[in-house]
Curated annotation (Swiss-Prot):
It is found in: Golgi apparatus membrane. It is an enzyme of class 2 (transferase). Its EC number is 2.4.3.6. Pfam families: Glyco_transf_29. GO terms for biological process: cellular response to interleukin-6; glycolipid biosynthetic process; protein glycosylation. One of its GO terms (molecular function) is N-acetyllactosaminide alpha-2,3-sialyltransferase activity. This is Type 2 lactosamine alpha-2,3-sialyltransferase. Belongs to the glycosyltransferase 29 family. Keywords: Glycoprotein, Glycosyltransferase, Golgi apparatus, Membrane, Signal-anchor, Transferase, Transmembrane, Transmembrane helix.
Amino acid sequence: MKGYVVAIFLSSIFLYYVLYCILWGTNGYWFPNEEMKSKNNVKNCFKKPAFASLLRFPQFYPFLCKADFVKVAATYGTNNFLLPYGVKTFESYFRSGLSKLQSCDLVGQFDTVPCKRCVVVGNGGVLKNKTLGAKIDSYDVIIRMNNGPVLGHEEEVGKRTTFRLFYPESVFSDPSHYDPNTTAVLVVFKPQDLRWLMEILIGKKINTDGFWKKPALKLIYKQYQIRILDPYIIREAAFQLLRFPRVFPKDQKPKHPTTGIIALTLAFHICSEVHLAGFKYNFYTPDSPLHYYGNATMSLMKKNAYHNLTAEQLFLKNLIKKKMVINLTQN
């Protein structure tokens, strides 16, 4: 009788594991892949997020690691896609860039907070005069993007930054914006971005050819603070979340996700609860402020042929309507 009870108990544990893998979309291996082996646990919260149904691989590790990025790319098909959605033909570029970085780990608080509340802070003018700074700083993880400053805007957007996504044309070069507690995440859109990273890390003169505007000629962050975002995250944002076509008609320029949507996709992989701020744009008032900083207006957005902002706004509206995310700047 005792053996029968033990057998039922062990069977229950096995069934729980199988159901857990199905619900969370894990890779199904008995032992995790290399990209899952981080000093910090990406998913150690048993509370299923409201957005879980959006992701095929919720436990996907978001940063590239030199030791296993080729294996990870083969596992998830990233080796079949060109930039910005894969590593195809540019594996050596990624390997060279990763060889100069000291770490691919997540940050320390991931060990201490089991269910992480995150806020993704956009740069939209809707943040002006909202005084959300204290609210934003109360989250476990704060994700920002590009050169959206906190210096001088603390009352509106807070002081803390956990992750800041950037590309060479958008990263800070003024040391007054340096934050030792920020992890700076390079989003690679083109081969020149990886060349730039190599040149800037080894102190070589920066080749500015191939950029849509002059990239930063120096980096305010230390090597230990820099990560490279896995292109799978960008691919997921484009094809799975925004439903962009794999091939655009010849008479149309291909559209790619904005850094904001990419940052949101990153949050879905490392957070249990996601809130947004600064993602609402007023397309009907061209003279309204584009950002919470500077003097740019919404009229500039009409000239942008690289992104599909209408599709992104509809996607965000749907997420908010279904309560998959909470919008702090709804009104």
